[in-house]
Curated annotation (Swiss-Prot):
It comes from Saccharomyces cerevisiae (strain ATCC 204508 / S288c). The gene is PUT1. This is Proline dehydrogenase, mitochondrial. Pathway: Amino-acid degradation; L-proline degradation into L-glutamate; L-glutamate from L-proline: step 1/2. The keyword Kinase does not apply. GO terms for biological process: proline catabolic process to glutamate. One of its GO terms (cellular component) is mitochondrion. Belongs to the proline oxidase family. InterPro entries: FAD-linked_oxidoreductase-like, Proline_DH_dom, Proline_oxidase. Its EC number is 1.5.5.2. Its main location: mitochondrion. The keyword Iron does not apply. It is an enzyme of class 1 (oxidoreductase).
């Protein structure tokens, strides 16, 4: 729910302390008639734990499981056993580096990874379209944020070329094929995820010392590599817009992935800012670059406000992918920088996405929040955004530029429910792909960093859901 355009008020009690600057740092919309901005929005979020109210339960998995082929059900059964309890999960994590790649490919990879090559990823995209998921966020899974492994086997130049090639050979045909057969603004953009730690040698030192003159050459190389890829996206957006001028959202988007806090603070935020200035000018109808903010960080609300102010002052738009966070188990000073409990993170996430969504609804193409990806497996957060978009009629720009995203193979019950029961069309899946050894590392990181999410999605509840879905599949 949003307040009416004629009279918007701030309800202080509904805004966490870190968001109070919203009241102080008001800004004026580019359109004089729009008196409503992120500074004076009434923020209304779903019932929160802190208020003692119920939290929306995720949909059961049975209906989705009934749509899967037998092979995928078998693979999911294996995942259910592997995540049955903490002992099983921790044992799998310890053994994972020693499990042969062919075994991982058979049991796990096809569920969570798009494939090893363009052909396999294209087929993955077609399967997703059949499920009502119009597009993907592709991620070539090669990274080295700790600077501990050599990239000599996959030189950075090759990663850049392969990434650009995936734009032209996967994302472009994936969306072109739909532009001629579906309503043009019902198709989500295609995204290419750029991991800064994969796009420069010695990434940890370069990102940590991003503003250090001694690292200028390496810094410039990282900026150039990201710019090469994003420029391809920008030029394709401009070209396609001439052919499809009624399109309200970008056709494709370059997305800067998050790194750990020290690298994010010292380098990645500045890298995002540079790319926003180059490829998201207010003079362009479409944005071409999105950055990532991890909202489990205590300072995330203030940081987004700071970035918003810089965007207003310098004539460009932000692109936001908002996640809860992926490094909770490996951050060195997590007790100081991350909310102390899940409730704090959930409240922060829902309030910030509410503010951004409301701003996009009210200000439309004049919003400095040019594009939003709600990257979450949390059903309450996804339904919050879905209901906000349903609450007003005149919000075609917001509907096109607010996209819901989940990881491939995860939260499929949520994805299925949003599409089937709520008519959501603005949905994508994050699709990692690439060399088997690298995707193996990705899968291990998912187990380590998302262990709690994996257990809640899988384990014994998944095994029971699979068992219940089998009789219905055979008509019993």
């Amino acid at each position: 729910m949003i307040a009416s355009k004629s009279s918007l008020l701030v309800t202080k009690s509904r805004i966490p302390s870190l968001c109070f600057p919203l009241i102080k740092r008001s800004y004026v919309s580019k359109t004089p008639t729009h008196s409503n901005t992120a500074a004076n929005l009434m923020v209304e979020t779903p019932a929160a734990n802190a208020n003692g109210n119920s939290v929306m339960a995720p949909p059961n998995s049975i209906n989705f499981l009934q749509t899967l082929p037998k092979k995928e059900l078998f693979q999911l059964g294996f995942i259910g056993i592997a995540t049955l309890n903490s002992f099983f999960l921790n044992t799998i994590i310890k053994l994972f580096p020693y499990i042969p790649i062919p075994v991982i490919k058979f049991f796990v990879s096809s569920l969570y990874c798009g494939g090893e090559n363009f052909k396999e990823v294209i087929e993955c995209g077609k399967r997703l379209q059949k499920r009502g998921i119009s597009n993907m966020m592709l991620s070539l899974t090669i990274e080295n944020s700790e600077g501990t492994k050599s990239l000599s086997s996959t030189p950075v130049d090759q990663i850049v070329k392969e990434t650009i090639s995936s734009v032209h050979n996967i994302l472009l045909p994936n969306i072109i094929g739909q532009l001629e057969s579906k309503p043009i603004n019902d198709i989500a953009p295609g995204y290419i995820a750029l991991k800064p730690s994969a796009l420069v040698d010695n990434p940890h030192e370069v990102l940590y010392n991003f503003s250090n003159p001694a690292y200028k050459a390496q810094r410039d190389q990282l900026i150039e590599n990201c710019s090469k890829i994003t420029k391809e996206i920008f030029e394709l957006n401009q070209s396609l817009l001439k052919k499809y001028p009624e399109r309200k959202a970008p056709f494709m988007v370059s997305t800067i992935d998050a790194e750990k806090y020290d690298l994010q603070e010292n380098g990645v935020y500045e890298l995002q800012r540079i790319l926003f200035q180059k490829f998201n000018p207010t003079s362009s109808k479409l944005i071409s670059c999105v950055g990532t903010w991890q909202l489990y960080l205590r300072d995330s609300g203030d940081h987004i406000l700071h970035e918003l102010k810089l965007a207003q002052e310098n004539g460009y738009k932000l692109g936001l992918k908002l996640v809860r966070g992926a490094y909770i188990h490996s951050e060195k000073n997590r007790n100081q920088i991350i909310f102390g409990d899940k409730t704090g993170t959930d409240e922060n996430y829902d309030r910030i996405i509410t503010q951004v969504v409301n701003d996009l609804i009210i200000n439309g193409e004049d919003s400095y929040f040019g594009h939003l990806v709600v990257a979450s497996h949390n059903y309450q957060s996804q339904m919050l955004v879905t209901n906000l978009l349903k609450s007003t009629q005149d919000n075609s720009y917001a509907k096109s530029n607010i996209v819901l995203g989940q990881l491939l193979g995860m939260a499929d019950n949520v994805t299925y429910d949003l599409i089937t029961n709520h008519g959501a069309k603005n949905i994508i899946k994050y699709v990692p792909w690439g060399p088997p050894l690298e995707t193996k590392d990705y899968l291990l990181r998912r187990l380590q960093e998302n262990g709690d999410a994996v257990r809640s999605d899988n384990g014994w509840p998944l095994i029971k859901a699979i068992a219940k879905s089998i009789p219905k599949r055979v008509g019993l």
